[in-house]
Amino acid sequence: MLACYAPVPAFLLPPRRIGWTLRLGSAVLLALLQGAVQAATPDWSGVWAMQGGTVFDLATQTGKGGSTTPGVREHPPYTPAYEAKYLANMALRDKGILPDPNSFCGIPTGFPRILNLPDVYEFAVTPQQVWIIAENGPNVLRIYTDGRAHPAPADRWPTHTGDSVGHWEGDTLVFDTVSLHSSENGRTLVDRTGLMLSEAAHVVSRMHINAAGLMEVQMTIDDQQALSAPWVVTKQFKQQDKGARVYDYACNENNRNPVDPKTGWTYTIGPDGRIIDQSATKK
C-alpha cells in the first residue's frame, strides 16, 4: 500500500525546525545564485601568448594603410609637445641609448604595456575580479568587476597599473583604467620605441575571444595632455597547447648588466665579471 505525505504547514512545525528550514532554504538559494553568476563568466583558462612583436602599435611605425614612407606615421595622434618628446625618444632609440626602465627590470611594466610583453599570460576570471597575469616580471593587472566605481579623485594617485573597474557585456569584459603614471621622469614607457602617455591617460578596453579563437583586447586611449584624438590599439593572444605552463620568471635575477647613467648604454658582462663589448666608447 502506498502512503501519501502532504507537506506540513509551517505553523505546525516547532520554532527550531522552522529556523533550520529557513536557513537551509537560504543556503540553497545562495548557492544557486552563485552558480548562476559563475556560469555567466566565460572560460578564459589556459596559457596564452601575445601575437605579433613588441611594438605596441604597428601604425606608429608605418603610414596610413601600411605605407612605409620614411618619416610618415599614422599613429599616435600626439599633440605637438608630445610629438617632440616622442621624436626625441626615437632619436635615442636609434642610437641604442633610450632610457627604458623596463629593459633592465627597473620598475613594474605598468598598463597598457603589460598587454605588450613577449612571454605568456594567464587570464583568471571570477565574479568579483579579473586578473591579467604576465609571466614576464611577473606583472599583474587587477580589474574589479563587483560593481564598485573608481575611488574619488582625492583618494587615488598615479600607479604603474592604475585603477581598473569593469563589467560584462555578454562574453566581453569592458574595463576602464585611470590613475596611471606619466611616461616621464623614469617611469615606464608604452613600448621599446619610446611611446609615451601622461598622467591624464584614460583607457577603455574591450576584451573577448573573437571568432578565430584569439583573445582580443581593443584599447581606446584618451589623453588630453598627450593626444589630439583617441588612439585605438588592438592586441591579440593565442591559446597555447593544453598542459602549457607559466614558469617562475624573476626579471631582476637576470639583471646583471649595468647601465652607464651618462650614456644610457647597457654593458655586456662576461663570466669573469668584466665588460666584453665596446658600448662605453660609443657616442
Feature roles, as predicted:
Residues 7-9, 207:
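Compositionally biased low-complexity segments enriched in histidine and/or tyrosine
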Residues 38-283:
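PEST-like low-complexity, intrinsically disordered acidic/proline/serine-rich tracts
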Residues 9, 14-19, 23-35:
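Bacterial N-terminal signal peptides
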